[in-house]
């Protein structure tokens, strides 16, 4: 069992007369080697926000450390995420995210994570995605299945 504070904000006591706004973790992906973690936390209110966070495992602290935060990685939420299986010749990790904005995105780590490709098909909704077992092929579904 492991505990990690993803949203880093839900501990504040409620202000008098104000409605508390708590973020919820809606999606989590862990790389097969356990070195990388991606989370999506959302706040659905008049202050709506979606944040994709990339975490790296630290052997020194024996803890995940936040590396990158991306606000609104997909403008209408994230359906799913998965890391590419890392092969023997691969040194750069990739994450595939599928959003409710009709797009799938590839994220790559350099010093920080950034979107390196945005994929869409005929204005159809992206409904799912995944990697082949060796990480060489991406499968995406668009539209009605």
What residue ranges belong to the model's regions?
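WD40-repeat beta-propeller superdomains and closely related acidic/aromatic-rich repeat-like regions
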Residues: 1-145
């Amino acid at each position: 069992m492991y505990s990690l504070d993803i949203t880093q904000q839900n501990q504040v006591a409620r202000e008098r007369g104000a409605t508390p706004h708590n973020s919820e973790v809606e999606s989590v992906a862990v790389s097969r080697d356990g070195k990388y973690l991606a989370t999506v936390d959302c706040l659905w209110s008049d202050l709506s926000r979606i944040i994709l966070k990339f975490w790296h495992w630290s052997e020194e602290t024996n803890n995940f450390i936040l590396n990158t935060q991306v606000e609104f990685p997909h403008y209408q939420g994230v359906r799913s995420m998965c890391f590419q299986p890392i092969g023997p010749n691969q040194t750069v990790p990739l994450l595939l995210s599928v959003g409710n904005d009709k797009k799938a995105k590839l994220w790559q780590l350099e010093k920080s994570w950034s979107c390196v490709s945005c994929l869409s098909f005929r204005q159809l909704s992206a409904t799912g995605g995944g990697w082949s077992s060796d990480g060489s092929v991406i499968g995406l579904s668009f539209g009605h299945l």
